Curated annotation (Swiss-Prot):
Record's bilayer topology term: Multi-pass membrane protein
Cross-referenced InterPro entries: Ammonium/urea_transptr, Ammonium_transpt, Ammonium_transpt_CS, NH4_transpt_AmtB-like_dom
Name of the protein in question: Ammonium transporter 3 member 3
GO molecular function term, any single one: ammonium channel activity
Organism: Oryza sativa subsp. japonica (Rice)
Function: Involved in ammonium transport.
Transmembrane portions of the chain: 31-51, 59-79, 135-155, 169-189, 198-218, 233-253, 265-287, 292-314, 318-337, 361-381, 407-427
SUPFAM superfamilies the record matches: Ammonium transporter
GO biological process: ammonium transmembrane transport
Keyword Transmembrane appears in the UniProt entry: yes
Length: 480
């Protein structure tokens, strides 16, 4: 190589324009894939194993279907509703994200420019150093996991056809509004509400919407509510492990760059999750006499959720404090308050998504308003002088902004989710028929999760040329 020559890896080519940062692009796609693995197969495995045996397939399929459905919604209209040009203060303009010229151009979040009242620029728009295609992929994984988390509130009784209608409607009218308002440059973003990686957009939204939908769908059968043991706790741990390690990309990818703030976010994520898991387990031992594996998983999740709104914005000691709070407050709301509050008893939130995601997400957003560190904020946020109340001065107002942002997300999800459920109920029953509730997977899908000889022979398609559903032919059979 001649002296002074640019190495091939850094030369500008048609496929590697001068604005492309290959390191950022590689990390962003890796982060997106890690988040995708949280859903596929992470939550598919977790849902399929944490429920009663007769609901294993139905629960896993709800997650599988949602993952695919969100992809189509996202690229056809929802991405630009969340991150495109402003239509309303809380909503972007719907248009496809499918054209080559759009997808290979540099990513620009046009509505994220911060302006003074006179119209002059205070902070430029966000322009990550990779193509739009990478951003579409990354954000699609967040949209997918949000609706899959929501599904956890509805396992064991929702009509699968109603769920198939619910997913695109909720993504369109609820998720896109929260995403644009807080991330895409909407009014909460402009005001300075902090949501680093989805404590509000993803977790508070899914927890509140899940509880609301559970109200409209109604409870599981009496026998299922009384006894609903996991069918495979070891697989629950496998799904939980994918969820935990996948959170490295979940929070580490949100600076939209492979920078020092990303490293801080990843470290804080694991500190908070570990602390929360230990606190939840200690409380289980102290009050119930023995540690619970399911309880430990719940503590892990609440820690991951709690750190998410401020993952790259708080110091390590604050991550420990947040872990202590996330391991104890959601534990109290789930194990004590839920059992004493008659209103919560009437709503059947199958996996306690309200506690593990809504309560923990709100807690994380509020504590971010307290502990957001000024220097770390300057590395990530577009709003100048952002900091938590703990650091004094104008930081006190940040806590109020965080509470106001949570109230908007909560109210929007209650109203929109209710409207969606009512509309669907006019066309399709929201619940599985009572007779099918007694049977489970076999009635809904004609399949069983653990079909062994004699038990599963009814649906063994190597013995029958058609499924138990009349009129549905089987093209290919396979011995496994």
């Amino acid at each position: 190589m001649a002296a002074g020559a640019i190495p091939m890896a850094y030369q500008t080519t048609p496929s590697s324009p001068d604005w492309l940062n290959k390191g950022d692009n590689a990390w962003q796609m890796t982060s997106a894939t890690l988040v995708g693995l949280q859903s596929m197969p992470g939550l598919v495995i977790l849902y399929g194993s944490i429920v009663k045996k007769k609901w294993a397939i139905n629960s896993a399929f709800m997650a599988l279907y949602a993952f695919a459905a969100v992809w189509i919604c996202w690229v056809v209209w929802a991405y630009n509703m969340s991150f495109g040009d402003r239509l309303l203060p809380f909503w972007g303009k719907a248009r496809p994200a499918l054209g080559q010229s759009f997808l290979v151009a540099q990513s620009e979040l046009t509505a994220t420019a911060i302006r003074y009242h006179n119209g002059s620029a205070e902070a430029p728009m966000l322009k990550p150093l990779y193509p739009v295609a990478t951003m579409v992929y990354f954000q699609c994984m967040f949209a997918s996991i949000t609706i899959i988390i929501l599904a956890g509130s509805l396992l064991g009784r929702m009509n699968i056809k109603a769920w198939m209608a619910f997913v695109p409607l909720w993504i369109t009218f609820s998720y896109t509004v929260c995403a644009f308002s807080l991330w895409g440059g909407g009014f909460l973003f402009q005001w300075g509400v902090i949501d680093y990686s989805g404590g509000y957009v993803i977790h508070l939204s899914s927890g509140i919407a899940g509880l609301t939908a559970a109200y409209w769908v109604g409870p599981r059968s009496a026998s299922d509510r009384e006894r609903f043991p996991p069918n495979n706790i070891l697989l629950v741990l496998a799904g939980a492990g994918l969820l935990w390690l996948g959170w490295t990309g979940f929070n580490g990818g949100d600076p939209y760059s492979a920078n020092i703030d990303s490293s801080m976010a990843v470290l804080n994520t694991h500190i908070c999750a570990s602390t929360s898991l230990l606190v939840w387990t200690i409380l289980d031992v102290f009050f119930f006499g023995k540690p619970s594996v399911i309880g430990a998983v719940q503590g892990m999740i609440t820690g991951l959720v709690c750190i998410t709104p401020g993952a790259g914005l708080v110091q390590g000691w604050a991550a420990i404090v947040m872990g202590i709070l996330s391991g104890s407050i959601p534990w109290y709301t789930m194990m004590v308050l839920h059992k004493k509050w008659s209103f919560m008893q009437r709503i059947d939130d199958t996996l306690g998504v309200f506690h593990t995601h809504a309560v923990a997400g709100f807690l994380g957003g509020a504590t971010t308003g307290l502990f957001a560190e000024p220097i770390l904020c300057s590395l990530f946020l577009s709003i100048p002088d952002s900091k938590g109340a703990f650091y004094g001065g104008p930081g006190g107002s940040q806590f109020g902004k965080q509470i106001a942002g949570a109230l908007f997300v909560t109210a929007w999800n209650i109203v929109i989710t209710s409207i969606i459920c009512v509309i669907i109920s006019l066309i399709l029953p929201l619940r599985i028929a009572d007779q099918e509730l007694l049977i489970g997977d076999d009635a809904v899908h004609g399949e069983e999760a653990y079909a062994i000889w004699a038990e599963g022979e009814l649906n063994d398609m190597t013995h029958h040329n058609e499924s138990t559903h009349s009129g549905v032919s089987v093209g290919v059979t396979q011995n496994v």
